[in-house]
Amino acid sequence: MKNAKILSNLISDKDALDNLNWQPHRRDGRANADIFELYDGRNNNNEGPKAALMRYRPGATVKPHLHPGYELIFVLKGTLINDTGEHPEGTLEVCPPGSTH
């Protein structure tokens, strides 16, 4: 497949995550968060698919916000604490369109 992004060993090699080109991400009032963009297929109306890896450092915060489309949260390292509880490594949370958190 041409132009495919291959990210290997993200689960088995925890250092692989540290080697990605993370960029600071402050959208929706985030603090202590970084983003690694995978793709952005949104159109001019901000509709369409987008995928990224997010890294939340200890003490990270996010203000409540709406997701117009699905959001998949897969915890690669550490523990995610949100309004649905505490989620350890290996947890996949599927948030439906229209969800807020």
What are these regions (language model features)?
Residues 1-47:
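A short, N-terminal "cap"/entry segment at the start of jelly-roll beta-barrel domains
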Residues 30-67, 81, 85-86, 96-100:
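Conserved short histidine dyad/triad with adjacent acidic residue
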Residues 70:
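Alpha/beta-hydrolase fold active-site loops
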Residues 73:
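Structured binding elements
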